[in-house]
Amino acid sequence: VSSLEPGRPVDPAVLRDLLGLTLNEGRIASLVGSGLQPRDAAAALGIAEETARSVLKRVFAKTGVSRQAELVALLARLAF
């Protein structure tokens, strides 16, 4: 297990397993957690920005965070 490197996305499957996210939620969480804005994460995944924001809201609910900065901090605390 290595530490989370700033700007480096976490494997979405790891987030799925550790946080109970779906794989799609893990993908969004990984990209936003690495510092991308939702619109940039959406573009990277080839989905609409509103879809990314909707998925991100579900990620927030499942992880107990309410802001992107809190998600970044949560992923850092998991110390992958």
Task: Briefly describe each language-model feature range.
Residues 1-23, 39, 78-80:
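Linker/hinge segments immediately adjacent to helix-turn-helix/homeobox DNA-binding domains
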Residues 68-79:
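Short, basic, alpha-helical segments at the C-terminal edge of helix-turn-helix-like DNA-binding modules
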Residues 24-28:
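The N-cap/first-turn positions of alpha helices
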Residues 35-70:
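Recognition helix of helix-turn-helix DNA-binding domains
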Residues 1-2, 32, 44:
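N-terminal start-of-chain detector that recognizes signal peptides
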Residues 13-19, 30, 57, 61, ...:
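Pre-signature/interface helix of ABC/ABC-like ATPase nucleotide-binding domains
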Residues 32-36, 75:
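Short helix-to-turn junction characteristic of helix-turn-helix DNA-binding domains
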